[in-house]
Amino acid sequence: MEAEIWGRRIRAFRKLKGYTQEGFAKALGISVSILGEIERGNRLPSAAIIQDAADVLNISADELAPPEK
């Protein structure tokens, strides 16, 4: 469940900032297949990937994080 929420948020911010999966994966230094797994919620992103994604998207990791209930 948590992986799905992270994946949806990463995908939404990626699209909002105009990145393709290929371009975003390259900027993160990961494969497109790993990014796809994360975005589909099949893989929980590591703390390093979360921070790298936030840096590439020019947002804070807190903004990228799912809201707490």
From Swiss-Prot:
SMART domains: HTH_XRE
GO BP, sorted A to Z: regulation of DNA-templated transcription
Domain (HTH cro/C1-type) ranges: 10-64
Keyword Ligase included in the entry's annotation: no
InterPro entries named among the record's database cross-references: Bact_TransReg_Diox, Cro/C1-type_HTH, Lambda_DNA-bd_dom_sf
Gene3D superfamilies named among the record's database cross-references: lambda repressor-like DNA-binding domains
Keywords (A to Z) from UniProt: DNA-binding, Transcription, Transcription regulation
DNA-binding residues (ranges): 21-40
GO molecular function terms listed in the Swiss-Prot or TrEMBL record: DNA binding; DNA-binding transcription factor activity
CDD domains xrefs: HTH_XRE
Protein name in the entry: Uncharacterized HTH-type transcriptional regulator YazB
Species in which this protein is naturally found: Bacillus subtilis (strain 168)
